[in-house]
Amino acid sequence: MKKLLLALALSAGFVASAQAQLTGNLGLTSDYRFRGVSQTQNAPAVQGGIDYAHKSGLYIGNWNSSVSSQVYTSGAGLESDLYAGYKKEIFKGITVDVGSYNYFYPRATTTARTGSDFNTYEAYVGLSHGDHITAKYSRTLGDGYFGTANAQGTTYMQADGKLPVPVIKNLAVVAHYGRTNVANSSTLDYNDINAGLVYSLPKSLDVSVKYFTNTGTTRTFETANTVSGQKLYKNAVVVGLTKTFN
């Protein structure tokens, strides 16, 4: 009987592992840009995360990056994100993705300008066609939006595209458009755009080169922090290297 129970337990463990996938990633970037805005005062960042995806479509993950302690005042120089959601193919090649994404900035103090901390909580829904086209809508659940108070209901809409270059193997053109609408502060609304190339190397390495621009103003990016004289929104070319672990 004990042997039978042991066999069943081992079998259950094998099935569970076969139905789930654990992956990790580690990256370097010349400038960490989030929705068009530099999080590192135009300086390099180290990034990495881990994802657990089940065959059912449920997933959970954590992603981290170094950030500027001047942008995120008196913080630990770290952004640590937690997210969870559900993905399902609803038509051939069309996948729906719903979930929650939560941004945390350990020890970052509340900002004098807004009275709100930087931690931000969002719900999202997205549609994608393979890895070629993605449309996503995110909405802030809490009162604060990265240091801007009274911002519950702030939305971010984005469209992303990725197309392989036929004449060069493993090379793809990528493009992104995003629109931020800050609740109760329409003067902070802006668009962000980036486009570039991604080249896949052996051993799950990707190299990217992208050009970033947006329509934001100085006020947009200095409202939520104490940085002055820093063009966190300026046009820039950003180079990145990412390694994926399966």
Feature map (PLM): residue ranges:
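Repeated loop/turn-to-beta-strand initiation elements of outer-membrane beta-barrel proteins
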Residues: 22-24, 56-60, 92-98, 131-137, ...
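Outer-membrane beta-barrel "beta-signal"
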Residues: 163, 195, 199-205, 211, ...
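Cleavable N-terminal export/targeting peptides
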Residues: 1-21, 246
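Transmembrane beta-strands of outer-membrane beta-barrel pores
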Residues: 28-34, 54, 64-68, 88, ...
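Surface-exposed loop and membrane-interface regions of Gram-negative outer-membrane beta-barrel proteins
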Residues: 58-117
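Residues that define the transmembrane beta-barrel architecture of outer-membrane proteins
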Residues: 42-46, 76-80, 117-121, 151-157, ...
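Structural signature of outer-membrane beta-barrel channels/translocons
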Residues: 13, 51-57, 87-89, 126-132, ...
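Short glycine/proline- and aromatic-enriched beta-strand/turn motifs that initiate or cap beta-hairpins
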Residues: 20-70, 236, 242, 246
